[in-house]
Amino acid sequence: MSNPSCILPADPRWPHRLLERLGKRTPPKLWALGNLDLLALPKTALFCSARCPGSTILATYDQAAHWRDAGRCIISGFHSPVEKECLRILLRGTSPVIICPARSLPKRIRPEWKQPLDTGRLLILSGFDDSEHRVTTELAIRRNRLVAALADEHYFAHIAPGSHTERLAQEVSGWQA
């Protein structure tokens, strides 16, 4: 497993789409652990409000299995219960995954992440420095914006009315206009 990297805008691996979509809200640095080459792949962002109907949950798990079997690179915070289960589904395959925590990079790597990191199919990417240890609503909003800006496609499994996810979906639709 590699050591964490700090990526600056001058780095050739820097995703230039960030500045196009986020403008002044672009993080000045990105911190990464894992295979940075995953940033160059076509990516689908996964978002799901914390509470959603059962039918949506099952359909989203089926979609995650489809992405896994198709080898699609999925990027997400994997924070909501549905997103967490999708991560478990994705990690059971060989497809690439980018996890973006709403805080600094983790100090300890979860056991289920070690093998995907070692084989180069996992990237843990954060827009937050070491001073941001705890997830907050504000950090989650900024993280979700980062995830959306990095993605080529966006999959909103469920958007609760009035939620932060709804506001993000509206922002993303403005990028595609």
Where are these regions (language model features)?
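Short, positively charged patches
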Residues: M1-I57
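A structural signal for isolated positions on well-ordered beta-strands in alpha/beta enzyme cores
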Residues: A45, I75, P96-C100
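Structural motif
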Residues: A10, L33, C48-R51, H79, ...
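Short active-site oxyanion
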Residues: P4, A70-I74
